[in-house]
């Protein structure tokens, strides 16, 4: 295990040195052994006979770590803030994983930094447990995401209305480059920094662009970032994830999900679903996420206008044309995803319509998204589910069965294919709240660990899976999530 600090070479405009806060009594709460092994952290700890709690709470520094808080700006709910930055996070450095990819290792909740703007720099145990469970569930679902290596309780209290136990999350991500990182320099008119940042992003995420130059490099870069966002949002829609705070400072260049603050899962299918208490206008509602990703990509494109062409009119035309590809690319990828969930091969518009009709039925009947697709998948190989689906959706199910038959693949094969896109279990909101409450009340991670066993196999029926499949009694109508906790 060798920590590197490549980000620091970008120059001191990009970050501010900041030392994590000393916790009074760091205790390991949750630990991701698989991730620790893949990063060489497990071997390091075994060799040194060290406990992870000190290193992953900020109490002690890993060898060669030079902690910094990263500078970034961001559009929050549409309004630009030129200076946000890591107000409660410390980048410890980078580690090379067993697949040779390089990952950032960052602490969150590790104390105030020069970017804290009056905030306390801390994190409560509840949100830390949420970040661990959600990110690990998303990774197991196959959704691009930052990971969580550890949650360490600090032994200190954090004030969030009441006193709550404090914790530090250790996050591992392909990088922490955000759209807001580019916006930070664009707002300062620092074209040179944007060029350097772009080269750095290419070296970490898009090495295939390394040999391109000039405007071609920049349009290639934008296309590559757009494509990752298209993929990411399609994956969110596939599993029913609502990010909740898709500000440009929470939008990564790598295309990974980051910041599990006010996120939630839909139960009843409704594109207008919004859970975040501060999202009064529903800007970040479930079905609006593709448009917001597009809007965020427009903010990124703006930062590149001076680099796309010297003539500003020409540059705007190039930017608009690149952005114009986004909705079409999204539609195409989305229909493909929906068809995979529905088991249909897309051979024409009538296949698209068949898949969309199913969503309309779920909406009209107020049905659970995950369980309905699960039942549809099972109906191909289980007569009980077949009867249930046939009576729930008489006309549609007949049309669908006929189409599946017509497309000529054996039912078992179609069911297997659908299963890869339809989880049997997701991190449902009511279970999340119950598990977090239990962890805090008992001062024990056991409830989280039992749930994680199931969430790490979201496409399989384990003996304890049924404990977590029930939709919320009220369809989550009164469920609310909160930011900045
Ligand atoms: N308790 C806090 N103290 C200081 N700064 C904070 C605190 N909570 C949030 N911030 C800062 O406010 C901004 C927006 O917060 P947001 O909730 O999006 O991020 P976050 O959850 O802290 O971190 P990340 O995006 O890295 O997951 C960020 O600059 C963040 O560092
Ligand atoms: Mg954030």
Curated annotation (Swiss-Prot):
GO molecular function: AMPylase activity; ATP binding; magnesium ion binding
Cofactors, names only: Mg(2+); Mn(2+)
Superkingdom of origin: Bacteria
Catalysed reactions, semicolon-separated: L-seryl-[protein] + ATP = 3-O-(5'-adenylyl)-L-seryl-[protein] + diphosphate; L-threonyl-[protein] + ATP = 3-O-(5'-adenylyl)-L-threonyl-[protein] + diphosphate; L-tyrosyl-[protein] + ATP = O-(5'-adenylyl)-L-tyrosyl-[protein] + diphosphate; L-histidyl-[protein] + UTP = N(tele)-(5'-uridylyl)-L-histidyl-[protein] + diphosphate
Amino acids binding Mg(2+): 250, 259
Family designation: Belongs to the SELO family.
Annotated protein name in UniProt: Protein nucleotidyltransferase YdiU
Organism: Teredinibacter turnerae (strain ATCC 39867 / T7901)
